Amino acid sequence: MASGDVRINVAVADRILLHLWEQDHQADHYLVSFEMTRPGIAEVCALHPPNVSRAMRELIQDGLVSEYTRTIRGDERRQKTWQLTDEGRTEARNRIEKLRSMMVLIREREGKLLEIRADKAAEHLQTGLTLLQVLM
């Protein structure tokens, strides 16, 4: 049964680090997907594009993210993209461990609310949701 207030509020920096972690297979590639650009990050992380830029400046200053200009699949022009630094990968892993243990509410087929760890929600729902999608 669900307890008290279990609204999830994931910090902007945590959303971005988690997203870049999920896209880390594209690190150091010449050609990357839309999800590595400012509009792509904004869309996936449910942020306004100016907030992505502001957060990226802070993450770059903290040494967690690096910025590149790359070719985007399906787009003729090059765009700014970001990826995790080695320090950013370590920090992302630490934050992901905390995010995985957060409790979320899901509704079962019978309509009953169930409070469950975020990292177990996709499996329980039998979906391919990422941790970020569960937390959003």
Segments the model singles out, each with a brief description of its role:
Residues 27-43:
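Short acidic, hydrophobic short linear motifs in intrinsically disordered regions
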Residues 9-13, 70-94:
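Short, cationic-aromatic polyanion-contact patches
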Residues 9-10, 29-34, 49:
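Alpha-helix N-cap/helix-initiation sites
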Residues 60-70:
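A short, conserved structural fragment
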Residues 1-26:
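Short alpha-helical segments that sit at the start of domains
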Residues 46-61:
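Short amphipathic alpha-helical interaction segments
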Residues 90-136:
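Amphipathic alpha-helical dimerization/coiled-coil segments
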